[in-house]
Amino acid sequence: MFSELVKEFHKKGIPTDKPDFYDHPNFIKEEQRDPSYLIKFAKFVAEKPYSNDYIEKAESIIFDVAKILSKQLLDNGRQGACVDISGILSRILELKGIWCACIKGSCTIDFPQKSNEKTTYFWSSDHGEFTAGHAWVFAPPFSIVDISLKQQLYTGTKKNYIPEIIMVKDA
């Protein structure tokens, strides 16, 4: 899959040597023809082989940037900023040479039974003018880097059960 994506991108004059190659004019041209083309970039990031040295370096950088940005989000107090903050996180990581992709999707949160809190859903919708149910960053070695889930609008004590930073390797 990875080599097929590399061939396709190169055939269309899209260089793949930098984490933000989706900003290349030829990539943008393809995305204008096919709005789902950005998914190919995410697949490229997911399928790309990474060295152990890269993974070790990336893990440290991702953790440090997520920690700083999470604190900024908490200090700001803005709720429901998942799309914006995930975009900012991915851009900072790209500037630091980290391969990543912003993921927009849905999210279900089940709370411990003792909490007496009901399951919370952030659903994506295929109809209407909605950006996303929720957004996070995929940045190998992490499948999920989410610094905004706790900063959504919740009722009751739900926030008490959600970590400020979620970093999952195998999702």
Predicted region positions:
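A structural boundary/capping signal
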Residues: 1-171
